[in-house]
Amino acid sequence: VAAAIGLKSQDLLLLDTFGAVTQPQDWEQGRRPIVWASNNFLMEQTGFSLATLRRHVRRLCEAGLIWMKDSPNGKRYGSRDEDGVIVEAYGFDLAPLAARNAEFEALYAHLQQERQFCKSMRNKITVTRRIIRAKIEKALESRLKGPWRDLQGEFALLLQRLPKRSTA
């Protein structure tokens, strides 16, 4: 899903870090998950430099996944009540991410369908390739009239042009 919406692995690392400092109740309906972690904490957790951290925050904002909720003094801070519910907070607002949950689930389902379709097509291509090779070989063994040697060579060239799939 991340690649489909233009995110890179480092964007995901930062989102994951944001998520790790939230609490389950932050994600309940009607609540706003806000992260007020310092730049130093975020840099320590991600291994980013300050410039890299700022770049990925900007990318997440541009992707519509987070908003900045600025305090009057420009600092990030927050407080929770005795139940752990955010009472007041300024920082990275993850509400856009939460609001797009259904969209991401639908996109994930669509991508899974596409992967399954591609897997099915690869399997069909493999079976068809084996059938063609077997028929050409059988024709050669049976000494049937026709350009079977030429077809065998053309088929080998065609197979060489097919993209190789990595097994990793």
Regions found by a protein language model. Name each.
Residues R133-A168:
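Electrostatic interaction modules used in gene-expression and signaling proteins
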Residues E62-S71:
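A short, conserved structural fragment
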Residues L111-T128, I132:
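Amphipathic alpha-helical coiled-coil segments
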Residues S71-S79:
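Short, Lys/Arg-rich nucleic-acid/phosphate-binding segment
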Residues G30-G47, L60:
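A short alpha-helical element within helix-turn-helix/winged-helix DNA-binding domains
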Residues V1-R32, K145:
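Short recognition helix of helix-turn-helix/winged-helix DNA-binding domains
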Residues D83-F117:
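Short, amphipathic alpha-helical interaction segments positioned at domain boundaries
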